[in-house]
Amino acid sequence: MNIYEYQAMALLNERGVSVVPGYMAANVEEAVKAAEQLSSPPYVIKSQILAGGRGKGYFRESPKEGGGVRLVSDIAAVKKQAESMLGRHLVTAQTDDQGIPVEKLLITEAVSIAREFYLSLLVDRQTGRVTFVASPEGGMDIETVAKEKPEAIHRIAIDPATGFQPHHGRMIGFALGLSGDVFKQGIKLAASLYKAFTTSDMSLLEINPLVETNDGKLLPVDAKISFDDNALFRHPDIAALGEAGASDPLEQEARQAGLSYIKLDGSIGCMVNGAGLAMGTMDIIQLHGEMPANFLDVGGGASKEKVAAAFRIILSDPSVKGILVNIFGGIMRCDILAEGIIAAARELDITVPLVVRLEGNNVNEGKAALVSSGLPIITASDLGDAAQKIVAAIRQTA
């Protein structure tokens, strides 16, 4: 689960990390009020979308007016810029060419920057450890730095048996090139970030840029946080952040139903159990010349209610021209799942082509139930067969 920058900054502040003062605004009046609450101009207006590259982005409706992050000199300019940003679609290197609508802004104080750094924490799958990634060269061009100057990227893994220790903080300070009092601030900041990361079950905590101000303070100016969806049950307050800030109502509905759903740009809706199987299904759809419309994992113990919810979510996307169900019945019985598919197909009156591939526990009974249902459900013997059939079906109906 991802959250917006304004939520990330507030969460870090609650966990003892000093951040640049700022307030969220959902309309022009709130933007003006937010600026009035800050100490003094200049101000920074930051578009709140769940994508990076905002500073170098542009608004689809007004590509020459400026990017998604703007520096303004007074409150009158806050009002003018908020009017030109809210409700428009911000296009960045991480969005499609349609962009993402900006529904919220973060108004912050501007800081005088002496140096910019990059600092993040993530779960390193190769080492199985929480790892700091640090670079003395932060800011909007960090991707270029990583590509052209990999020696400027430093990784510090934390042994879970010992946790964060003072020497880790010193290693991070040296990696960033800090000195003097700012070095001490860096050690304290790293310890606070590690504690926030581990106690909140984060999967990514990225500070870019982390800045040293002209008056010698070390402050996060921007923060990106992702959480482990499987641990959200331990953090209802954090789960509420995702529900309040969800940019896609279908993703919010899926989360509430216990489903993992991500909307994509294709035309074939996918319903699969297991993330690995889901990715394999999406790959083979592309291999046969079409694109998946979504990633949807119903999990290992999908009930009839979950299956029905999954179909509702998939069919709510008008770009879906056909549906491929690919289920391996291990814990889940294929005959029970088939009953759920049949019930959902009847309840929702599915009119797009539906191909179902079942394998595993009680697979023969499941296939028999689908065939005898009287519904236009196309069964498949394996994943390749399923992909061929759904691609052929949507092209035939096009």
Swiss-Prot record:
ATP binds at K46, G53, R54, G55, V111, E116. The keyword Magnesium applies. It catalyses: succinate + ATP + CoA = succinyl-CoA + ADP + phosphate; GTP + succinate + CoA = succinyl-CoA + GDP + phosphate. Mg(2+) binds at N208, D222. Heterotetramer of two alpha and two beta subunits. Binds 1 Mg(2+) ion per subunit. Residues 9-253 form the ATP-grasp domain. Succinyl-CoA synthetase functions in the citric acid cycle (TCA), coupling the hydrolysis of succinyl-CoA to the synthesis of either ATP or GTP and thus represents the only step of substrate-level phosphorylation in the TCA. The beta subunit provides nucleotide specificity of the enzyme and binds the substrate succinate, while the binding sites for coenzyme A and phosphate are found in the alpha subunit. Belongs to the succinate/malate CoA ligase beta subunit family. Its cofactor is Mg(2+). HAMAP family: Succ_CoA_beta. Its EC number is 6.2.1.5. It comes from Zymomonas mobilis subsp. mobilis (strain ATCC 31821 / ZM4 / CP4). Keywords: ATP-binding, Ligase, Magnesium, Metal-binding, Nucleotide-binding, Tricarboxylic acid cycle. GO terms for cellular component: cytosol; succinate-CoA ligase complex. Pathway: Carbohydrate metabolism; tricarboxylic acid cycle; succinate from succinyl-CoA (ligase route): step 1/1. It is an enzyme of class 6 (ligase). GO terms for molecular function: ATP binding; magnesium ion binding; succinate-CoA ligase (ADP-forming) activity; succinate-CoA ligase (GDP-forming) activity. GO terms for biological process: succinyl-CoA metabolic process; tricarboxylic acid cycle. The keyword Metal-binding applies. PROSITE patterns: ATP_GRASP (PS50975), SUCCINYL_COA_LIG_3 (PS01217). This is Succinate--CoA ligase [ADP-forming] subunit beta. InterPro entries: ATP-grasp, ATP-grasp_succ-CoA_synth-type, ATP_grasp_subdomain_1, Succ-CoA_synthase_bsu_CS, SUCC_ACL_C, Succ_CoA_ligase-like_bsu, Succinyl-CoA_synth-like. PANTHER family: SUCCINATE--COA LIGASE [GDP-FORMING] SUBUNIT BETA, MITOCHONDRIAL, SUCCINYL-COA SYNTHETASE BETA CHAIN. Substrate binds at N273, G330, I331, M332.
